[in-house]
Amino acid sequence: MTQLTHFDTAGQAHMVDVGDKASTHRVAVATGTITMLPDTFALVRDGNAKKGDVLGIARVAAIMATKRTADLIPLCHPIGLTKVAVDFALDEAGSSITCTVRTETRGQTGVEMEALTGVQVALLTIYDMCKAVDRGMVMGNVKLLEKHGGKSGDWVSTPAG
């Protein structure tokens, strides 16, 4: 099993030194879903939410969050993102919205945390904008779908994970 990299030999937390790592193209894709009442889903789908364009604002929130990840996750490196793409898939039958965030950089560390942070903040933004009509919304199934680049190479989620 791979050792945890954010702890030194004495068990103290530290930020990993990536200074000697090669700068490579890195990509990460993460996803997550929010499920809501059918009436709430219709408000979002039709653009009739009282607070405005829910998905448009959630998209901007996700992009902003990816850029602030190092401010939120204590041992995460601040990195220069070269691309952030945010997509939403609406599932009317399930009254759910799936957010997918793709992050890219050319750097010495991966962008998985940025993609995951973007997804979470997008879902939280949807919740915030719709909570007046539906406090029972459920966010879940947040996960990394794939990552590419870097020393550890490529990784793609399996259906079970």
Curated annotation (Swiss-Prot):
Q: Which reaction does it catalyse?
A: (8S)-3',8-cyclo-7,8-dihydroguanosine 5'-triphosphate = cyclic pyranopterin phosphate + diphosphate
Cysteines engaged in disulfide bonds, as pairs? none
Q: Which GO terms describe its biological process?
A: Mo-molybdopterin cofactor biosynthetic process
Q: Which NCBIfam families does the record match to this protein? A: moaC, PRK09364.1
**Which sites are catalytic?**
D128
Name the job this protein performs: Catalyzes the conversion of (8S)-3',8-cyclo-7,8-dihydroguanosine 5'-triphosphate to cyclic pyranopterin monophosphate (cPMP).
- Sites where the protein binds substrate: L75, C76, H77, M113, E114
Q: Which HAMAP family match?
A: MoaC_B
Top-level EC class: lyase
Per UniProt, the keywords (alphabetical) are: Lyase, Molybdenum cofactor biosynthesis
Q: How does it assemble?
A: Homohexamer; trimer of dimers.
Q: Which family does it belong to?
A: Belongs to the MoaC family.
Pathway per its UniProt entry is: Cofactor biosynthesis; molybdopterin biosynthesis
The source's domain of life comes to Bacteria
Sample GO molecular function, one term: cyclic pyranopterin monophosphate synthase activity
Q: Which SUPFAM superfamilies match?
A: Molybdenum cofactor biosynthesis protein C, MoaC
Q: List the Pfam families.
A: MoaC
Q: Which organism is it from?
A: Cupriavidus pinatubonensis (strain JMP 134 / LMG 1197) (Cupriavidus necator (strain JMP 134))
**EC code(s) of this entry:** 4.6.1.17
What protein is this chain from?
Cyclic pyranopterin monophosphate synthase
